[in-house]
Amino acid sequence: GLKYSIKTIAEKQFNEIFLYDGIAVLNSADFDEKQLEDKISSIAQVDKSMLMQSTDGIAENESENQSVSMIVPKAPENMGDYIDLVSAENGSNLEVKSGSVIITQKLAKLLDLKTGDTITIKLSGHEEKEFKIGGVSKNYALHYIYITPDDFESVYGEKPVYNLSFIDLKKDTDENSFK
């Protein structure tokens, strides 16, 4: 029943969409960006990592609003190493590119949006902003919006503050022993 369907959704999300081995959640007040990258890369079991900013907000239309997380990858060109952004519309690979955002499938359905439409987002601590949708990606849990660092800075007038890192471990690492 319900337990099985929740387990199935989580397995699909973490086997098909999220490709990373782990996430380090960072208290950005403790480190600057360079220190964070150095600290993570100094961990012997880490093969590669990428800093991200995750900010909570609300996406809305005239009749509906949904909680979202806006993800700003430091290196959007490497996003595919950590999250498989596949078009829900045609199965092609999506890239986080300047001038538009990628939103996830269920969010698009709930707000009746598609590629080329405009989405309204209110992030915590910011005013409502509108974004052109450059793609709708497959996703099984929660709602995400992906945007480039340059577009984030252009729209919000501030540089991203990277507060998490996606991590891939070396092949011979026991994931259960990594802390």
List where the protein language model places each region.
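Small-residue transmembrane helix packing/gating motifs
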Residues: I17-F18, E95, V136-N176
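Short, conserved charged micro-motifs
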Residues: F31-E37, D172-K179
